Amino acid sequence: MTSLSVNDRKDFVDGQMKYWRQIAESDGFDIDDVPVPRGTRAGLWSVDCKHPRFRLRACLPKIYAMVGLHRYNLLRGTNFEHLELLKYNESMNCVCSYYITSVAVDLSSQLQKTFQIRVDEKSFGDLDLTVSVARPNDEEKVTTEKRFIHHFHCEAAADDFYKGALPDWPSVGDLNNQKRFYMVKKCELQSNDWIRLYLELAVGVRYQQTSESDLSKLQVLKVAIETKEEDVQPPNRRLKSKSLHVYITFKGLAKAPIGDEIGEHVERKAIVRRVIDERSGHLTLLGGFSNAKNDLNQSSDDEQPFGKRRRI
């Protein structure tokens, strides 16, 4: 292997510093005219979604854009819905950061806006990510006075109840405690479409090449919401909690993310934790799958009363 001369090494370092300085000027979003220096192995790939040959083969960029809008709506009380992807930049790693530019429409006014959304993955193949930027592109930008880090580097600050590994799937005794859990009614699923979004996200992250056609087969069967706050009134107000655990029973996935049962008819279980840090605005989502046998709508007097659950 030929080693670089002193001058070559200096040119390489200078080129990298200039490259990342230009990236930082737009927070990683508008880099169409920024050339990638030769030898770069940890830069950003740019994808033009409006190019005639562009085809969205994997669903993650679109789902990430939708999650970013979800974060914006939660914090601002708005009702923007994803319309189309314009472009996105993706870090050159297995565990990626995405800088997405997309168009969304406000369902209440039909106003369209262009959004910039940043999603940082923390692990590969499992749902563990943070949305740190979700803003209309005409709003004030993050300035370069703040150091630009192009990969995962922070997450939403969480209460102890929402830290650590995901909880076990709740037992029947757990679910009988209505001070802690809320069973979502079927009529509430449409107005809380973020529940399905979280399920699609968990599946899409586990199976990176999942298509929109694959996701359309998923059917949400039952949902339970858990929050730290006890005796919330009315009970369905838990759906608006900034931090929560959501337990989803579903079918429509032929593969087995956990266990060995194959087929779209098989009922499967997903758990997703949501934490929103209102101070920083960060949204962190952590998710996984369970092969617990108990059902969400079972009821029995033989189960142990609700208490602290073992965490995995």
UniProtKB/Swiss-Prot annotation:
InterPro entries in UniProt: MS5 (IPR006462)
Cross-referenced Pfam families: protein_MS5
Protein family: Belongs to the UPF0725 (EMB2204) family.
Protein name: UPF0725 protein At3g19520
Originating organism: Arabidopsis thaliana (Mouse-ear cress)
